[in-house]
A protein has these predicted regions:
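A glycine-rich phosphate-binding loop feature that marks nucleotide/adenosyl-phosphate handling sites
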Residues: 1-6, 93-97, 118-126
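Acidic catalytic cores of enzymes that act on phosphate-bearing nucleotides/polynucleotides
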Residues: 110-163
């Protein structure tokens, strides 16, 4: 399978079989998208998040708002944060992820679309998606040196020098 934006005029072969040219490739649950730089798709995580959230929010027996938010953060949000340590979403993609979470919180507390749920989320003690991504990324980079791998340690030091 050939992955990339530039497609060659001639067929590439491996083990005497033609390599297939693709625009997206799913690897370890993450969809990598073809382009000038490495990008990732949010469509699959958003679909799984919304599916889990709809199941939770449309249950025939309603639990308390506090329990529902706890379940939302325990069951649904991990669909959005899977592999977040390694992913670099665009600001538009990150905005879409935040909107999905905020819409669910609005549904739980019967807020209107124009009402902010930031203060509500903070009062309940739940982190924002930005805080979750930052915390997990920092923890990932802090544990990298334990691997005793010179290449990974070099890459880790370069990635934090840029910040």
């Amino acid at each position: 399978m050939l992955f990339g934006k530039n497609r060659s005029c001639f067929a590439l072969k491996m083990y005497e079989k033609d390599l297939e040219v693709v625009d997206e490739y799913k690897y370890l649950g993450v969809t990598v998208v073809t382009g000038d730089s490495i990008t990732f798709s949010t469509s699959r995580p958003l679909r799984h998040f919304r599916s889990a959230a709809n199941t939770l929010l449309s249950a025939p027996v309603k639990s308390s708002e506090t329990v529902t938010v706890k379940l939302l953060y325990t069951i649904c949000i991990p669909n959005l944060t899977y592999a977040c340590e390694a992913l670099n979403y665009s600001s538009r993609q990150f905005h879409d992820l935040n909107v999905a979470i905020n819409d669910c919180l609005r549904k739980v507390f019967n807020y209107n679309r124009w009402e902010s749920v930031r203060f509500l989320r903070q009062e309940l003690g739940y982190p924002s998606l930005t805080e979750i991504f930052r915390s997990r990324s920092r923890k990932f980079h802090d544990c990298m040196h334990l691997l005793q791998n010179d290449t990974l340690n070099l890459l880790n030091s370069l990635s934090f020098d840029e910040e």
